[in-house]
Amino acid sequence: MSRKICVFISELTILIALSSVSTNAQDISELENSVNKLMDSLSDEVKKDMKSIGVDSPDIMSLSDVSFDSVISLIVDKLSQNSKAPLSASAVVIAVLILNALFDSYTDSLRQSSTKEVLSVVSTLCITTTLVLPVIDLIDDCIITVTDASNFMLLYIPIMVAILTFSGHAVSGASYYSLMVLACQGVSQLSTKFISPLLNIYLGFCVSSSISDRVNLKSLCNMLSKVIKWLIAFTMTVFSALMTIRGMITTAYDSVTARAVRFTMSSFIPIVGAALSESYKTIQGSINLLRTGAGVFVILAILVVFLPSILRCLIWMFSLSLCKTIGEIIGVSSPISMLSSVSSVVSTVFAITVCIMSVFVISTALLITLGGGAQ
């Protein structure tokens, strides 16, 4: 009688284990479909750019087709697309600087302080009207880029949590979900309701302080610039450190749990325990491969999403630096102050954009590198 009971329990255990393996296979297929839908959530322009570098899907084989030449070609193409407005504005600014220097050099009446002040104000106003609106557009474009990237990450996070759970990293998935949802929601809300108005106010202060020496806001502008950059750097450092520490702790916990599960299967399930343990390990390996493909795809997608905004900021910084250099060569001082102020705003926008992109990329990369599978 006891022998029959043992045989019945063994058969029931085998059926449950085989059913679990079959269910896991179906779940893996559903996860693959969810990962493939990430491509559809991107904008048409980003899809086109991803395909231009050889990425048609989050499949690991498609990701391996990315080449250095295709990436450089995409960067050059984006540079040519985003350089027209900054270079056109720079040409106008350089023309104003040259006219200012000519009038200052060849007209004796301009040696009077009041007339020279009028010329300085007029030149600064001309440069202001040329630069302010494009810089405001640059700020708005960067905020839109950050919002789009945050929304994409919010679509990706539940998929990655499911992958982590099925690969034996349930604790890591829960930790990642809580941190990243908070980060993405916070970045999206702060970008539209705080960062964008703050940058526009900062630009207004910089312009006001450069038009006339009677409104001396340069110290305030310098302080705002330093505070913004230090806050961004501090927040990014704390977030990255928190992600790393929690990732290391949860990965160690998940690794012990997975080893305990495999040990239990191989030790307490008779006859086929060792085979089921190896099957469990194989399923984990396939899910880890899916996780790596999804993570690398998201990193590439985030980089492509941020690429136009980052290149625009770099081109603007180069153009403004070129104008400042020419202004210093020909000896005009007041317009140079305006150019320095606008350049400070653009560099702040660039720092914010790069830091937010880095947070998304680092958090995704940590999931790939930390706990590369419950071995």
Where are these regions (language model features)?
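Gly/Ser-rich, low-complexity
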Residues: 1-97, 101-120, 133-144, 148, ...
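Interfacial loop-to-transmembrane junctions
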Residues: 330-350
